[in-house]
Amino acid sequence: MQKALEAYLKEVFGTSVKLLEFQRLGAGVHGAGFLLKIDTEDGIKSYVLKDLAPEGLGHDYPSDRAAVFLLAQETYGRLPKHVKAIDVISMKDDGTMKSIGGGVDYFLLMEMAEGENYFIDLSEFSNKDILDERDRNKIEAMTSYLAEIHSVKKDSKTLYWRKLRDTVGHGECLMGVFDSYPDGTLPYNEMAEIVKKSVDWIAKLKPKFKRLSQIHGDFHPGNIWFSLTPNSELRTKIDFILLDRSRGPWGDPADDVTALTINYIFFSIKHLGTVRGPYLEGLRLFFERYVTLTGDDELLSLVAPFYAFRGAVVANPIFYPELTPDHRKLIFRFVNNVLDDERFRPESVNDYLR
């Protein structure tokens, strides 16, 4: 690390800089600090290099720690009498160190996906009486994929609890989505009731940390793009590519399963006012195939808080302005009734709308 740090310092302070001292100052719950004493053209200067301990306090992933330091660099110098942050430094896989600080915004460059997203299929279900072979093959492809990625497990109570906490409290999840609602969409006390029920579910699920699995994190129809050419790697007649993996690579498989299956319910309510036809068939088939492939029958006993989050998403007027107030009421009724039930029953989904 010291050689990499010396190379970084020469880039920032000039090639004549010399690292005179590099020693650990101490460590606490959050992380450790290191004293840097360097000889520059302007004289000897002392700095502190700070790190954050992984796993715990929301610092579980490198991106978490980067976010803390980027905010620190942005805000330290704006408060009177506060020490100033000089830079934010990243360490690469090869051990080299590089500045990532000073940006006013950040961007992600990624590959382009081609094909048709699964929203198109869900809309077309409204014109069918039953699923056709291609519809069933797509569900087979999606459940097979999820069964495969969810088979990768990780032993970490911290990360499982983090995912449970984020499902309710993250800015992109239940509470954050509710905060984005236009006033009048749902009374605040009704939002709070859903949140409180979800928190109670989190307490029930905490002992289930052995379920921690590799997940996509946002497995919804807009992020699933089906191609027109088959791929033998999936061993199916259908292939797809995914977008926008989100909010961490580890969690409960219920996160991915509910992200997709809420849409059979949502689209059916939107088009038909109840859950029936190809939508009900798709919902049942998805759970049937997934449980058969994974043996994870327990999943049906813990989907409730994940459905609360996903229900809040599809009922959001900002995301789906075409939804009528009556349809939103059905979705919120579904959410509350699922939260009140001990086990989700896909075959009786319409009972949750009453």
What are these regions (language model features)?
Residues G56, N117, I224, W250, ...:
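Conserved protein kinase catalytic core
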Residues E111-A113, L159-K204, N316:
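Active-site catalytic-loop/activation-segment of kinase and kinase-like phosphoryl-transfer enzymes
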Residues R24-D39, G43-I44, V48, I149, ...:
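Active-site acidic catalytic loop and adjacent metal/ATP-binding pocket
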Residues M1-Y47, G56, D60-A67, L79-A85, ...:
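Regulatory N- and C-terminal appendages and interdomain linkers associated
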Residues G295-Y307:
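All-alpha amphipathic helical-bundle segments outside canonical DNA-binding/catalytic cores
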Residues V29-A32, D39, I44-V168:
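Conserved ATP-binding subdomain of kinase catalytic cores across diverse folds
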